């Protein structure tokens, strides 16, 4: 079972699921891959929590709350990963480039692999 942590944006998760189905077509429905999409759209803003202002991505924020924001996003991502792990997924895919900023911290806290886009592409 593939675990997909989506919702960052929702369309990216749906697009990934669509491509997964197209690229792994079976002759009958039962041959398609098994997956769970958790569309966790309530994850706080990722760019802001790593010190990037969304109005101008080249301007770093000097906000002293960035560590707090970082940890809020980490907690929310971890909740999603734990839910997928609990539901017997063999690995997790997160179709959001920015979410991979938390990859190392997430991977330390769960027992199944997370596929890291930035290291696989």
Pin down the residues of each PLM region.
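Non-catalytic structural scaffold of enzyme domains
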Residues: 1-121
């Amino acid at each position: 079972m593939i675990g997909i942590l989506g919702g960052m944006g929702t369309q990216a998760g749906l697009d990934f699921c669509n491509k997964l189905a197209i690229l792994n077509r079976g002759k009958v429905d039962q041959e398609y891959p098994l997956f769970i999409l958790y569309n966790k759209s309530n994850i706080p803003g990722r760019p802001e929590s790593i010190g990037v202002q969304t109005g101008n991505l080249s301007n770093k924020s000097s906000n002293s709350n960035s560590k707090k924001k970082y940890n809020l996003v980490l907690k929310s991502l971890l909740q999603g990963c734990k839910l997928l792990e609990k539901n017997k997924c063999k690995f997790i895919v997160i179709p959001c480039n920015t979410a991979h900023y938390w990859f190392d911290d997430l991977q330390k806290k769960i027992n199944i692999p997370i596929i890291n886009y930035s290291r696989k592409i």
